[in-house]
A protein has these predicted regions:
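Pseudouridine synthases involved in rRNA/tRNA modification
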Residues: 1-3, 7, 11, 18-22, ...
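Residue-level signal for inorganic ion chemistry
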Residues: 16-17, 60, 86, 125, ...
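Glycine- and acidic-residue-rich catalytic/RNA-contacting loop of pseudouridine synthases
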Residues: 21-34, 70, 87-135, 151, ...
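A short alpha->loop->secondary-structure connector
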Residues: 31-32, 75-82
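Glycine/acidic-rich beta-strand-loop module
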Residues: 42-77
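Short hydrophobic/aromatic beta-strand micro-patches
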Residues: 61-63, 87-89, 140
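Short, solvent-exposed secondary-structure boundary/capping segments
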Residues: 133-139, 204
């Protein structure tokens, strides 16, 4: 397997991880970090954050131990701005705003959102209609909890399309994509965005393929609001 490298720096790279690929070593598989190291022809790369197996999109891998410590700290201290895209078929309780609450383990490897806010998962979002019974969510997680966005979407009454663990409709993939990362790296402003891998339809997903032009228009509109 060859991974798409969307950004390369002397200290780190950013790949576009396909959905269905675990960042951890599965029992029968070679781990993602080993595969990327082999692709680059280097002894090792370092994982500094994680994406769920079902999530596609931007994943940073450090190329040396010092960079790994720096980037891991930035993620831990919420110094890296993240933007995710999700699709859902069910109408949300609200169309934009903030989802906040503590997260507790539930059954079958799932998590649930609680009303308490001692150490809350925080996600800001806006949404736009793409078609009847299909809605785009642009999400800005302010924390980095396990399954945070998937749980937030379920709490809105709009589980992610394809995310059966949280009640989403069956689809060809889970429609959650890590679209953009923005951060300062020793005075260098790094901002990276990447679409799903359109050249491989199975990895991208049919709905991202069909509606990407409309999705890009909404992303452009949201970016203009922040300027």
């Amino acid at each position: 397997m060859t991974f798409q490298i969307v950004f390369q720096h002397p200290d780190f790279i950013v790949i576009n991880k396909p959905n269905g690929i675990s960042v951890h070593k599965d029992d029968a598989d070679v781990g993602l970090t080993r595969l990327v190291a082999q692709q680059l022809g280097v002894p090792q790369v370092w994982l500094v954050h994680r994406l769920d197996k079902v999530t596609s999109g931007l994943l940073i891998l450090a190329l040396n131990e010092k960079a790994a410590m720096t980037l891991s700290r930035k993620f831990a201290e919420h110094q890296i701005q993240k933007t995710y895209l999700a699709l859902a078929t069910q109408k949300p309780k609200k169309k934009q705003g903030r989802i906040s609450g503590d997260m507790l383990k539930a059954r079958r490897g799932a998590w649930k959102l609680c009303q308490s806010k001692e150490n809350p998962a925080i996600t800001d979002f806006v949404s736009h209609s793409l078609a009847p019974n299909l809605r785009l969510f642009i999400l800005y997680p302010k924390t980095g909890k396990t399954h945070q966005i998937r749980v937030a979407m379920k709490s809105l009454g709009s589980p992610i399309l394809g995310d059966e663990l949280y009640g989403g409709e069956v689809a060809d993939r889970t429609y959650l994509h890590a679209y953009q990362l923005s951060f300062d790296y020793f005075g260098e402003v790094v901002q990276i965005s990447s679409s799903p891998e359109f050249q491989e339809r199975q990895k991208c997903g049919d709905f991202f393929q069909r509606f990407w032009h409309d999705i890009e228009k909404h992303l452009h509109s949201e970016n203009e609001k922040t300027l």
